[in-house]
């Protein structure tokens, strides 16, 4: 009956331990996926997050508001509320935007799914927000049909321009085909030979602004599939249109156009025109953010200047000049430069009506780089212009100019569409060096593992070869991993950081076009260390699993001897399988990203030399998930199952023939259980508990995890080396030798008596009494005698 109760208790303990382990691992995996999907947490700003309201963000010392809000803290409304007019319902519309109606064309119409009408939200002359009249579209027309109509010379361009503007009002729905058709239609409206009305052209400007809200992928497909020069034609037509506004301007959220005319008076000598774009509370362009000044001496940027262009020209040949500012570079699809960051790259165009007799106009520019300084550091830039024939950026005639005011300066000896292609380094927050706890723990582990390996090899003849072999390989892999972790986990690029906004380190003589807007300084050594850490940690877990499998066969299956070639088989698994996993991981990543010079960052992190943390949408492709977390989780689950099985069936199994006390027996069971848990790597389950959201709880589990796992080598040394009789015997000899040497030096003239020690052990029928006696005699020999009540005294060594 008692044995049944004990068995039921052991089964209950096993079930509870298994459930707890499963819950911890399951919650840990779930938290990993959730944290990866949420993305990496951004560094906290010194300004409270509550300062900028209504979705505003704190950047470069001020609040950057969304289109719907403005003001110092983004608390002033900049939108028209929901409205209903002529049976059409409109949602909230930002100022300066056309809002589409919620009513859409029917499924049986050519324009199915598109809004039936649009409505403008604008500012009055007195600064009041007001809604304009509703413009109703034609559901029987779409962009493809309008593209065919605009080719007809007699087509009503006003109606076509209005229809295109309505059809492009919802930029989220625009496809590459829609953009191509709309671009061709707008290009015809701006064509001077079509003599479109000024109203039609102004509406076409609204269409271009709406097109620039479409996705970058859609524009890339346009550039890749368009058979004609639709984008190039539109760019040329916009330049020409900028000369026709007199001294007026047209400003939309994504594009601003301004002209300047010169009188015939004083038409001798040079003339300079300065065009400025000021920083705003949002990323959209507004009419109050652009200025033009004629007959100026030079550039004059201030703290609010985002970009400024100085056009140097000969007045007697020039009567008109025009400027165009694009909010982003989506119309300029480059084959050599790829933008990966999410900040907008403004493009500025300048054009004059110079005739062929004088092409002496030149351009000076200053740009204030607008980017997230918490995430990026300016690395370099290139002064470029858009080559219309090559359909790409070019540097001919452009050069960098040095400045001490924090602006990026360029100079070109011709006029066209200009840009500054900036490259950035990510401002990585490199972690501090390992703390004292990690250093001390790793040092103790390295020492313990080295001593364990030496001891196991030296005393291998008195041990079972298979057990010694598994333990030695486990210790070697852990030893190498700890050494690599201590001396190689930090990225040496940490020492190459420069201060934010420091343009003095830029090479002004180099004006080459970069391949991308973000750059990472390559560090092959860090990549190699990350691969080695990846490999040796997988090797460690593999030998943990092999240790569990070996003990299972020895203790549960009682296979003595082990299968033939067992050592060779487990050696190939322990060292070969992790090598295959690492090789496949690196090979796949390199094959997919080998053309990218920064391919190594798809494998490792930049902050530390370890596997890369995936982007929010890259969980499935993550090397950390498939080549580390998944195999380690499988190993831990199997090791926990074997650990519970061995603990219940072997370590904590009741033995009726025990002769020691219950206290000693329980202590031995606890030590044996800890010994098995250490070589099985059970303490790594604590890593899953570090994924909780509560900072205080996470810190506690982090310290516990660090304490148990950095000292794992020391634990193995204590449990598998210090506790052995061979080590204790050899250690006692060494201590006795050192003690005797010390005594001889301290008391050289004292004659010590010769002692003979006899030890008697009395074992009664109840094993709770254990007594020892010592007798002092003149003989140097020592003997131990064990006595019991039922037997005569027996002498033993």
UniProtKB/Swiss-Prot annotation:
Protein name per the record: Adhesion G-protein coupled receptor G7
Q: Which residues cross the membrane?
A: 439-459, 469-489, 529-549, 566-586, 624-644, 670-690, 699-719
Q: Which Pfam families match?
A: 7tm_2, GPR128_GAIN_subdom_B, GPR128_GAIN_subdomA, GPR128_N, GPS
- The glycosylation sites annotated in the UniProt record are 82, 159, 178, 191, 247, 261, 312, 316, 387, 413
Q: What does this protein do?
A: Orphan receptor.
Q: SUPFAM superfamilies this protein is in?
A: Family A G protein-coupled receptor-like (SSF81321)
Q: Which cysteines are joined by disulfide bonds?
A: 383-410, 398-412
Q: What InterPro entries has UniProt attached to this entry?
A: ADGR_G7, GAIN_B, GAIN_dom_sf, GPCR_2-like_7TM, GPCR_2_secretin-like, GPR128_7tmB2, GPR128_GAIN_subdom_A, GPR128_GAIN_subdom_B
Cytoplasmic compartment segments = 460-468, 550-565, 645-669, 720-797
Listed GO biological process terms: adenylate cyclase-activating G protein-coupled receptor signaling pathway; cell surface receptor signaling pathway; G protein-coupled receptor signaling pathway
**Where primarily located?**
membrane
Q: Which residues lie on this side of the membrane: Extracellular?
A: 27-438, 490-528, 587-623, 691-698
> Which GO terms of the cellular component aspect does the record hold?
membrane; plasma membrane
User: Which locations, inside or outside the cell, does it occupy?
Assistant: Membrane
Alphabetically sorted, this entry's keywords are: Disulfide bond, G-protein coupled receptor, Glycoprotein, Membrane, Receptor, Signal, Transducer, Transmembrane, Transmembrane helix
Signal peptide as annotated in the record: 1-26
Disulfide bond as a keyword of this entry, yes or no, is: yes
What PROSITE patterns is this protein classified in?
A: G_PROTEIN_RECEP_F2_4, GAIN_B
> In what residue span(s) does the GAIN-B domain sit?
275-428
Q: Which domain of life is it from?
A: Eukaryota
* Family per record: Belongs to the G-protein coupled receptor 2 family. Adhesion G-protein coupled receptor (ADGR) subfamily.
Question: Which residue intervals make up region (GPS)?
Answer: 383-428
